[in-house]
Amino acid sequence: MNRTTNLVYAGTFAGTLLALSLWSLKGAAGFSTADNTPVLNGKLALAFEKHYDEEFPIKKLGTNLWAALDYTLFGEGRPGVVIGANQWLFSDEEFKPTAAASQNITDNQALIQGVRETLARNNVQLVMAILPAKARLYPENFGEQQPASLHEQLYQNFRRIVADAGIQAPDLLGPLQQAKAGGQVFLRTDTHWTPYGAQVVAGQLATTIKPIGVLPESGNVYVTETLPGGPHKGDLTNFLPLDPLFEELLPPPDQLAKHNTRQQEESAPAGDDLFAETQVPVALVGTSYSADERWNFAGALRQALGSDLVNFAEDGRGPLLPMLKFLQSEDFKKSPPRLVIWEFPERYLPMAYDLSEFDADWIAQLKAAGRQDKQLADNTATNQGARH
């Protein structure tokens, strides 16, 4: 009996291996290279090895299988995602501790204050949009994992830092929490917010900005059209390599409608001044929350402010690098806007940044200006406290 069982196991294994090997030949059949690819120096062999490795089914099977085991048995994905409850996924950047967080916060605080000083010298008003973490807004959908203590007061501490620096930064947490009753403000399987969440933030920013009086009366009216959308594969599912073999285990995709904001009507320049200023008065700088048109944050801001804007946000670069790039740009140097809106997710404050693409002396000057500004603010606060 044991001999028969062993033979069955051996035969099954050999048959499976043979079948997978034959299946893998399909990928080899599709291999092709340029006619002039040299053979003797090994480039042809390396090209075939790379192609075969990508097409080899056992590799894909192993990847899918281990991902399925981690996900179903342990509730885990690849580094980058935290599995929550109710089919929710979170970025692990909102949960894990950050190395050298305290020093990073100090350095980034100096840079933020240096940015404010640079803008102020050019008569540019800065308003920051500090975005609360998705995890802060949806703690009811946590799984077993909880955010590290670093994140507990990060949003409140960030707002205090910018307030001490004299930077306008309206509270966005409260309005987003209230807006949850009307719909999702963040996508379930994605790092990013929904167009609805972006609209809520745009409205709150406009409430802060309009009384400042920094924007000219344009009379422009913007309207947003909502178009049929469809399933949205969230970026956090990329850390769950379950498809194609175990795709049914993935959380169901979010449904994402398309939003398009356009100017409804144009107003003529005031009076008879044919040379009235046509410069766009607002610059938006930030991350993929602002850069990605699917969330329509730039459009929502245009509608809420009644003003056009130029979007300098970039995808995959964090909030600091696009801002530093903007300050170095000819657009800013030759024609600075009246207002800069800086979208800055809270989770980026304790992170370290590679600033090697910028001149080291300029970065040092920016930090020094920021630290000097902080010291002046601290001394002012101390003197005011002494008077009382």
Curated annotation (Swiss-Prot):
- Name its species: Azotobacter vinelandii
Query: Which cysteines in this chain are paired by disulphide bridges?
Result: none
- Record keywords, A-Z: Acyltransferase, Alginate biosynthesis, Cell inner membrane, Cell membrane, Membrane, Periplasm, Signal, Transferase
What does UniProt list as catalytic?
A: 190, 192, 288
Subcellular location(s): the record lists:
Cell inner membrane; Periplasm
Tell me, which GO biological process terms does this entry list? alginic acid biosynthetic process
Instruction: Describe the task this protein carries out.
Output: Together with AlgI and AlgF, forms an inner membrane complex which probably interacts with the alginate polymerization-transport complex and adds acetyl groups at the O-2 and O-3 positions of mannuronate residues. Acetylation of alginate increases cyst resistance to desiccation.
Protein's recorded name: Probable alginate O-acetylase AlgJ
Enzyme class, broadest EC rank: transferase
Q: Which InterPro entries does this entry report, sorted A to Z?
A: AlgJ (IPR034657), ALGX/ALGJ_SGNH-like (IPR031811)
Just give the chief location class. membrane
Q: What is the lineage of its organism?
A: Bacteria, Pseudomonadati, Pseudomonadota, Gammaproteobacteria, Pseudomonadales
Q: Which CDD domains match?
A: AlgJ_like
Q: Name one GO cellular component term.
A: periplasmic space
